[in-house]
Amino acid sequence: MKERQRWSGEEDALLRAYVRQFGPREWHLVSERMNKPLNRDAKSCLERWKNYLKPGIKKGSLTEEEQRLVIRLQEKHGNKWKKIAAEVPGRTAKRLGKWWEVFKEKQQREEKESNKRVEPIDESKYDRILESFAEKLVKERSNVVPAAAAAATVVMANSNGGFLHSEQQVQPPNPVIPPWLATSNNGNNVVARPPSVTLTLSPSTVAAAAPQPPIPWLQQQQPERAENGPGGLVLGSMMPSCSGSSESVFLSELVECCRELEEGHRAWADHKKEAAWRLRRLELQLESEKTCRQREKMEEIEAKMKALREEQKNAMEKIEGEYREQLVGLRRDAEAKDQKLADQWTSRHIRLTKFLEQQMGCRLDRP
């Protein structure tokens, strides 16, 4: 329908010309009086004029001062937009109502995002912690494991009359993160088992190896070690695995603590954001209250100045009236004196005239 279409510039110009000639009334006679077709009903013309074309209506977004004023007035009057628009110059009730709806939707969306937003845990934050811990752990293992393995090898070699030969040559640990501590950042979560020292008794190796001269102080301690059983072998083979299990437990506890720390940090960040939002709203409210109080004070001062002007005007009028009355009285007295002097002069003139007439008559009567 035509009523639902956007207004064109020609239609707006037609409405302005109609209002200049006939005033903002009788909108159903626009087409008839202007001799131009306008497919709009009277209500649409009235709304268009009142909300968009009326002189003095501001266009564009609300300023920060107007926003604070609208927030304060909405808290005071509720959704009575006509009453609010009467206190916000240049803004219509329809415009303020639409702005308030958009403002409330934005606030609700921000609250939902701040309450329900869950940030993914960034595993890269733990890399430095795990790396430093792994380096420290590897240094400790590099000092403990070779000594234990060497002691176990010497004990087993002296008890069996030959040498123990491992399947692989024991190398000092690499100072970087071992593979069983490394975690995949791609999400595969493949964890390697911790390294352990494995000793084997190989007959071919023992037969092929050349006998070495026995060490006297080791031969003295050999019966005691034989009575205690294969303690050196158990020490060399079990100690790394036990330490590896305790390290894995400690690592799991460390990761759990880091996660709890991250969750606490996230909760603190959310709380800080919400507190900042509440503080911002409180600042807006205080700013609006300050603006309102300033405006009320200015209105009060203007009212007092107006009363003083009225009092001054009345005082000046009173003084002017008294002066006018005094002037009128002086003029009346002066006129009375003039009239009295004129009457005296007239009476004297009449008396003189009569005297002259008498004298002239006497002279004529004499021979």
From Swiss-Prot:
UniProt KW keywords: Coiled coil, DNA-binding, Flowering, Nucleus, Repeat, Repressor, Stress response, Transcription, Transcription regulation
Subcellular location: Nucleus
GO cellular component: condensed chromosome; nucleolus; nucleus
Keyword Oxidoreductase: no
Induction statement: Circadian-regulation with an afternoon peak in long days and with a broad night peak in short days. Expression of AS1 in stem cells of the shoot apical meristem is prevented by SHOOT MERISTEMLESS (STM). Expression is activated by GTE6 during leaf morphogenesis.
UniProt main location, coarse: nucleus
DNA bind region: 27-53, 81-104
A GO MF label: DNA binding
Coiled coil regions in record: 260-344
Phenotype upon gene inactivation: Plants with double mutations in this protein and in RH10 or AS2 protein have abaxialized filamentous and trumpet-like leaves at high temperatures. In double mutants, shapes of epidermal cells of the filamentous leaves are simple and rectangular, similar to those of a petiole, but different from those of flat leaves of wild-type plants.
UniProt-listed SUPFAM superfamilies: Homeodomain-like (SSF46689)
Domain HTH myb-type: 1-53, 54-108
Superkingdom field: Eukaryota
Domain topic, free-text comment: A C-terminal domain (252-356) is required for dimerization.
Task performed by this protein: Transcription factor required for normal cell differentiation. Positively regulates LATERAL ORGAN BOUNDARIES (LOB) within the shoot apex, and the class III HD-ZIP genes REV, PHB, and PHV. Interacts directly with ASYMMETRIC LEAVES 2 (LBD6/AS2) to repress the knox homeobox genes BP/KNAT1, KNAT2, and KNAT6 and the abaxial determinants ARF3/ETT, KAN2 and YAB5. May act in parallel with the RDR6-SGS3-AGO7 pathway, an endogenous RNA silencing pathway, to regulate the leaf morphogenesis. Binds directly to KNAT1, KNAT2, and KNATM chromatin, regulating leaf development.
Protein name per UniProt: Transcription factor AS1
UniProt gene name: AS1
